[in-house]
Amino acid sequence: MSMVYLIRPLKLLVIFVATSCVSLPTMAFEPLNTDDAGTIGKNVNQIEQYFYVLHNNVAGNPGGEASPGEEFRGIGNAKAFPLTYTYGLSESTEMSLATTYYSTPRGSYAPFANNILGLKWRFMGDGGSGFGMAIKPMITLPASTSQQVQGLGLAKTNYKLHYMLSYYWDSFQVHTNISYARNPYNKNYPISGSYAPNQTNIVSGSIAPVWIVNSWLKLALDIGSSIDTLPNSGAVNDYGMVAAIFSINKNIDIGLSYLQSGTTPSNAVSGKGITSDRSEIGVTWRF
């Protein structure tokens, strides 16, 4: 893990992302939080297996506006292996199944949580040039009450609708996301020991400009914010991330990232008063 923690000192939040060759369909942007409007293509399979180390300073905080499936609402440290399988139903649609195995924390509950079903539809563009738009509804299956108590999920079905807008140039890309999440939970049980009201109606936005260095390396910035839509509620999280993904060949990418989040953008960037931080490394395989 020493290679991952080399990224921690960086305060200017610049993301290094490498994926497949530019001429190929755009693939999912793991480990970025911001997704792109591209799809993997008909009959293509994709597996994303990652490992992250996360520290939360605030109970109930969802891991710094976490990537879908990587939410951790407990306080303290977590170590987990998020896994996502994606299958291309057509050139413009894909379905995904995701789960996360937690090695830390452990207890008298199943270590698998954040079980998510997703369907992505690109309704504008070819996913590789010019404008592209896509939507992705997602359903997170209920966690057990024991998992909710530890912050490994919420003990009710959660829903999210994700909108993606991308623009692709030859050497530059911009991806923006807007989403709404409905996150009910079992109020008879705490979330990581806290009975304080959890954010249940979340609107999120993010942007990730991407600089294409060559066919195996991209550089990007990923920043975002989430706001509770309830009256008198402020920002839930602002985040910034650094990452690097190296394309071994056209079908295999190795990525690593570092994320900081805070209750204000300046906290997220400076690292002062951060609510959480996450280091992540993993591989994406298409076949």
Model regions and ranges:
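Short, Lys/Arg-enriched N-terminal segments with co-localized hydrophobic residues
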Residues: 1-2, 27
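Bacterial N-terminal signal peptides that target proteins for export
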Residues: 2-14
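N-terminal signal peptide c-region/cleavage motif recognized by signal peptidases
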Residues: 23-25
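Transmembrane beta-barrel domains of Gram-negative outer membranes and organellar outer membranes
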Residues: 27-287
